[in-house]
Amino acid sequence: MPSYTVTVATGSQWFAGTDDYIYLSLIGSAGCSEKHLLDKAFYNDFERGAVDSYDVTVDEELGEIYLVKIEKRKYWLHDDWYLKYITLKTPHGDYIEFPCYRWITGEGEIVLRDGRAKLARDDQIHILKQHRRKELEARQKQYRWMEWNPGFPLSIDAKCHKDLPRDIQFDSEKGVDFVLNYSKAMENLFINRFMHMFQSSWHDFADFEKIFVKISNTISERVKNHWQEDLMFGYQFLNGCNPVLIKRCTALPPKLPVTTEMVECSLERQLSLEQEVQEGNIFIVDYELLDGIDANKTDPCTHQFLAAPICLLYKNLANKIVPIAIQLNQTPGESNPIFLPTDSKYDWLLAKIWVRSSDFHVHQTITHLLRTHLVSEVFGIAMYRQLPAVHPLFKLLVAHVRFTIAINTKAREQLICEYGLFDKANATGGGGHVQMVQRAVQDLTYSSLCFPEAIKARGMDSTEDIPFYFYRDDGLLVWEAIQSFTMEVVSIYYENDQVVEEDQELQDFVKDVYVYGMRGKKASGFPKSIKSREKLSEYLTVVIFTASAQHAAVNFGQYDWCSWIPNAPPTMRAPPPTAKGVVTIEQIVDTLPDRGRSCWHLGAVWALSQFQENELFLGMYPEEHFIEKPVKEAMIRFRKNLEAIVSVIAERNKNKKLPYYYLSPDRIPNSVAI
């Protein structure tokens, strides 16, 4: 009788093993086997991290093996089991790999196909077509769209983490508990003694050092020492944790009535302000999005305030960006003066602090939450709903949506919900952050997620004119490496554009993103369909780059740039000044966050800036969903390209007082998971 050797690999994460009964059935072209119990006498099967082998003898020849069915039945108490893969050695000596990388829960079962990636058109056998269809039908029942707030991109239909499908939950929910992590962070930073001191002001700037962790030769220490300087202020628009707002100014906006006379002390080329604009030396950052947003009113004992500043910047003769004019609200007038570097020291400093605070709000809610977290969740849900596990694009993308839906669900449960942690320390808490997302969705376009196009649209693409924009330089290198990789994968499975156009599962995936993620907005520019290999490669690059590089660039620098509270105040306790010459140091300190809010803020930026244990960085694919040699070779080339970029960035950063490393591939996690 024919005999098969079955190798079963159990996951190595916590609680991956099982004591339940595991049964296996083989389904082939010539028939199906009986159900076989996988069990070895006096042996503890399916332990965490184990690879177990079993001999399975069948009554008759099964022909070509199409499917492997695994069933789990209760032994004593139910325990979930994480199955990595099954390898089958046939009676003819052939080896067939069946990737799984999924949890089997309860009295569950799972049916696996071999690891060869297949488009729907490649499946001509009825049982394989049926398996493909049933998998998507089941997934679409599990992964349902839900509107969390009106106008938001749709998210997963789950009220809390435990409501999620087991396959996309965190291995241990405890590790991503925001309340626990923030509390731990404050304990690790030795600031928990201050965390309940709301309404208690700091005495002066030096007093903030009581909660500042001094680590020499770090960016955070340099920020603390130089945050008041115009050069440091300007540098952050290029290479801080929100390097996506600065634009080249092509015409001075009427709402900012600044004149040459006002700023002539800052201009170094003997040109008028209008001439400097024409020469491309003037830049602008406009926080119009914050105009009219409701400030946090959740604490009746503390009034909190927002501004909507406009900041004009200048490229000096050293090619450095420095501020030359700041207006703290959108409507010009006597009570909304334009602050200048020539004003009194504290007038100018407070104006810059207001800009930094506004930048923090836009960064957290729009640059970070909306444009990486929520967008990546949309891609993830659409992928699970429309691409079966055998589809090459599922195999390509699954590593880049790992834990994204889970972290967003935890955020909605604990962080950005009503009375959540976000409300504790942020002036946009209490609903302002929701209003901001609802506004910003209108500007969420496909082209703004295409990195080279986004840089060009802001007039920031010239390396000659703007030489110290490392976010742009490194981002382009990583974008090109990802695009080269996706084009290789696309070319392996789609021999021409027609195959792309006729792949209905791909088209359904793209349509799901457009209809539910972008809410069917034509102005978003998101494609409803994809008709060429080139456009498909670009689309996949957007998905991967957003989840990996873009998130890394705007997330992991938060402690570096925001831990010194005066450089990134999460709230302000007095309104913006309406006149010049009245600001004092005492007024500035009383405007900055109190001790309690400072500590909650510090705990947040520390926790959000930490890599996960066993982090998977860009190019690392330990789950072998692909088994074909051409794709594995493409992955090797991808990793080599990324290693070369790591070397380029390391060489540039040598001896730099302010190194830029957020887009070094060895520091870019594969997915949004924190």
UniProtKB/Swiss-Prot annotation:
InterPro entries: LipOase (IPR000907), LipOase_C (IPR013819), LipOase_C_sf (IPR036226), LipOase_CS (IPR020834), LipOase_Fe_BS (IPR020833), LipOase_mml (IPR001885), PLAT/LH2_dom (IPR001024), PLAT/LH2_dom_sf (IPR036392). Its main location: cytoplasm. The modification Phosphoserine is found at residues 272, 524. It is an enzyme of class 1 (oxidoreductase). It is found in: Cytoplasm; Nucleus matrix; Nucleus membrane; Cytoplasm, Perinuclear region. One of its GO terms (biological process) is lipoxin biosynthetic process. The record marks 103 as: Essential for stabilizing binding to COTL1. Its EC number is 1.13.11.-, 1.13.11.34. Changing residue 672 to M: Loss of activity. GO terms for cellular component: cytoplasm; cytosol; nuclear envelope lumen; nuclear matrix; nuclear membrane; nucleoplasm; nucleus; perinuclear region of cytoplasm. Binds 1 Fe cation per subunit. The keyword Cell membrane does not apply. Residues 119-674 form the Lipoxygenase domain. One of its GO terms (molecular function) is iron ion binding. Keywords: Calcium, Cytoplasm, Dioxygenase, Hydrolase, Iron, Leukotriene biosynthesis, Lipid metabolism, Membrane, Metal-binding, Nucleus, Oxidoreductase, Phosphoprotein. Ca(2+) 2 binds at residues 18-19, 44-45, 47. Ca(2+) 1 binds at residues 17, 79-80. It catalyses: (5Z,8Z,11Z,14Z)-eicosatetraenoate + O2 = (5S)-hydroperoxy-(6E,8Z,11Z,14Z)-eicosatetraenoate; (5Z,8Z,11Z,14Z)-eicosatetraenoate + O2 = leukotriene A4 + H2O; (5Z,8Z,11Z,14Z)-eicosatetraenoate + O2 = (8S)-hydroperoxy-(5Z,9E,11Z,14Z)-eicosatetraenoate; (5Z,8Z,11Z,14Z)-eicosatetraenoate + O2 = (12S)-hydroperoxy-(5Z,8Z,10E,14Z)-eicosatetraenoate. Can be converted from pro-inflammatory 5-lipoxygenase to anti-inflammatory 15-lipoxygenase by reducing the volume of the substrate-binding pocket. Homodimer. Interacts with ALOX5AP and LTC4S. Interacts with COTL1, the interaction is required for stability and efficient catalytic activity. Interacts with PIK3R1; this interaction bridges ALOX5 with CD40 after CD40 ligation in B cells and leads to the production of reactive oxygen species (ROS). Interacts (via PLAT domain) with DICER1 (via Dicer dsRNA-binding fold domain); this interaction enhances arachidonate 5-lipoxygenase activity and modifies the miRNA precursor processing activity of DICER1. Belongs to the lipoxygenase family. This is Polyunsaturated fatty acid 5-lipoxygenase. It comes from Mus musculus.
